């Protein structure tokens, strides 16, 4: 534990670089990047429930894409549900980095494991999604059970930086899609269908929000580079 306290800044940046590299590796990288997909789709699902709508199905796919099929009355509710995914991912990344900064590493595992369990039990419908959520939950429960401080910190930081980086990357991808293929720009297209506001406008707003939250995360919760010099 003393080693972790004195070296967590270095370990954080090692994990940040590892996450950026590892998540680009086929299969294994996509497996870990699915944690951000889980959070994104959970955002749609939870907002649906908050608005008294119905979550019909959540699907997670091996290519890190996902879908959430919902029922909701009124265009305002439908717009809020379509809007939820990217902001929830960005805010979850912020929350995880805040908890990491405060030393509440176990809380990160508890939160992500709880989200996976709830979605798996109530809404997941496809085989890959069930496989991924099941193995993700088992991995985290083993980490929690053995409670090895360095491994707890390593995985908590790893998940945090994956959600943080993938929230940014996916928002950039959404913006590019809204420019090149506005009819296939995911949530931005869905928002256009409900509000008639062009998909690119929604993509810009979502990207701006994600970058703002990410900037707050960096300036407040990233370990100071000066401590490494």
At which residue positions do the language-model features occur?
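Metalloprotease/metallohydrolase-associated module, dominated by Zn2+-dependent proteases
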Residues: 4-8, 12-14, 58, 67-222
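Small-residue-rich helix-interface/hinge motifs
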Residues: 23-78
């Amino acid at each position: 534990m003393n080693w972790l306290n004195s070296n967590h800044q270095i370990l954080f940046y090692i994990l940040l670089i590892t996450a950026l590299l590892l998540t680009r590796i086929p299969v294994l990288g996509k497996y870990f990047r699915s944690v951000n997909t889980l959070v994104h789709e959970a955002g749609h699902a939870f907002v649906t429930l908050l608005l008294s709508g119905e979550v019909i199905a959540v699907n997670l796919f091996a290519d890190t894409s996902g879908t959430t099929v919902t029922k909701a009355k009124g265009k305002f509710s439908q717009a809020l549900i379509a809007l939820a995914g990217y902001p929830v991912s960005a805010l979850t990344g912020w929350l995880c980095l805040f908890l990491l900064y405060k030393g509440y590493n176990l809380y990160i595992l508890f939160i992500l494991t709880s989200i996976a369990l709830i979605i798996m039990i109530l809404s997941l419908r496809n085989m890959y999604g069930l496989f991924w959520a099941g193995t993700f939950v088992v991995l985290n429960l083993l980490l929690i059970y053995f409670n090895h401080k360095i491994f707890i910190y390593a995985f908590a930081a790893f998940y945090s930086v994956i959600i943080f980086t993938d929230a940014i990357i996916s928002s950039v991808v959404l913006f590019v899609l809204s420019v090149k293929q506005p009819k296939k720009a995911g949530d931005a297209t869905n928002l256009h269908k409900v509000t008639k506001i062009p998909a690119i406008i929604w993509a810009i707003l979502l990207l701006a929000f994600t970058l703002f939250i990410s900037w707050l995360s960096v300036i407040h919760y990233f370990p100071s580079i000066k401590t490494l010099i």
